[in-house]
């Protein structure tokens, strides 16, 4: 009989929960079957190879204090909040079958009268009169002796907000990569009103034990206990760093324009790995040297607010008589970059 292990996270910190996944994947005994259940505060989670500027409405996220997190697995951008339960399965590679995990989820949902169906490799659907709608998406990862499968279960997420955070301003961005396809989604409460995270956790653990015909060792993980694990602390620091969240981005272009005190400004940035690789400023500003200094000071800088402020500070130092107008340019740029 295989050993069964269940981890339940009491933390709502997205970077810590994703770091816990990494710790489970790299450090636990791969011969056991593991289930990790967790949820996050309001967070947009993007895939390993996605562009946050292209996938997310960063301005709205900043205003409403929504976290950004990046997975180590592929797939598209998703929105997490406390009405969204996340699952992670770890299995020995030789016995791993995605269908097993899907069956565990479906068996748990039957408790609430919900009949799910699988679609393709990643999505789980529930039928509606106007067609099936997605309530879960997932991603996968493996190495020589273990396989990893994680995903989301939409319980009662505010789907309007989800659309807002995952809808970029199309006027501002032209990314080289393909943007995520927004599938039609549904909450499980639309089929089973009143379903909540604690109920899902209870039924998922029971379904996990029933499927493998055993009793699982259940362990609750808190923020305090997780921080005591050195490997986990290292993973947390990496997954919450600017370099991981924003620097791990392929080349893309970002255009912004506005009428300001010093004239009309039309900035074209070329960004790669979170750095300003090149830029061009089109403007009717009457101070050409200021434009040259702006261009040179911004080129090569990190594409984030503090780096832009540092660059503009040096330009303002050279052109003190234009300090007010340059401060306006600075605030406008930082608002558009929004990190």
Swiss-Prot record:
<dbReference type="InterPro" id="IPR004143">
    <property type="entry name" value="BPL_LPL_catalytic"/>
</dbReference>
<comment type="pathway">
    <text>Protein modification; protein lipoylation via exogenous pathway; protein N(6)-(lipoyl)lysine from lipoate: step 1/2.</text>
</comment>
<feature type="binding site">
    <location>
        <begin position="76"/>
        <end position="79"/>
    </location>
    <ligand>
        <name>ATP</name>
    </ligand>
</feature>
<dbReference type="Pfam" id="PF10437">
    <property type="entry name" value="Lip_prot_lig_C"/>
</dbReference>
<keyword id="KW-0547">Nucleotide-binding</keyword>
<comment type="subunit">
    <text>Monomer.</text>
</comment>
<dbReference type="GO" id="GO:0005737">
    <property type="term" value="C:cytoplasm"/>
</dbReference>
<dbReference type="GO" id="GO:0005524">
    <property type="term" value="F:ATP binding"/>
</dbReference>
<comment type="similarity">
    <text>Belongs to the LplA family.</text>
</comment>
<dbReference type="InterPro" id="IPR045864">
    <property type="entry name" value="aa-tRNA-synth_II/BPL/LPL"/>
</dbReference>
<feature type="binding site">
    <location>
        <position position="134"/>
    </location>
    <ligand>
        <name>(R)-lipoate</name>
    </ligand>
</feature>
<keyword id="KW-0436">Ligase</keyword>
<comment type="pathway">
    <text>Protein modification; protein lipoylation via exogenous pathway; protein N(6)-(lipoyl)lysine from lipoate: step 2/2.</text>
</comment>
<dbReference type="GO" id="GO:0017118">
    <property type="term" value="F:lipoyltransferase activity"/>
</dbReference>
<feature type="binding site">
    <location>
        <position position="134"/>
    </location>
    <ligand>
        <name>ATP</name>
    </ligand>
</feature>
<keyword id="KW-0067">ATP-binding</keyword>
<dbReference type="Pfam" id="PF21948">
    <property type="entry name" value="LplA-B_cat"/>
</dbReference>
<feature type="binding site">
    <location>
        <position position="71"/>
    </location>
    <ligand>
        <name>ATP</name>
    </ligand>
</feature>
<dbReference type="InterPro" id="IPR004562">
    <property type="entry name" value="LipoylTrfase_LipoateP_Ligase"/>
</dbReference>
<dbReference type="GO" id="GO:0036211">
    <property type="term" value="P:protein modification process"/>
</dbReference>
<comment type="function">
    <text>Catalyzes both the ATP-dependent activation of exogenously supplied lipoate to lipoyl-AMP and the transfer of the activated lipoyl onto the lipoyl domains of lipoate-dependent enzymes.</text>
</comment>
<dbReference type="GO" id="GO:0016979">
    <property type="term" value="F:lipoate-protein ligase activity"/>
</dbReference>
<dbReference type="InterPro" id="IPR019491">
    <property type="entry name" value="Lipoate_protein_ligase_C"/>
</dbReference>
<dbReference type="InterPro" id="IPR023741">
    <property type="entry name" value="Lipoate_ligase_A"/>
</dbReference>
<protein>
    <recommendedName>
        <fullName>Lipoate-protein ligase A</fullName>
        <ecNumber>6.3.1.20</ecNumber>
    </recommendedName>
</protein>
<keyword id="KW-0963">Cytoplasm</keyword>
<feature type="domain" description="BPL/LPL catalytic">
    <location>
        <begin position="29"/>
        <end position="216"/>
    </location>
</feature>
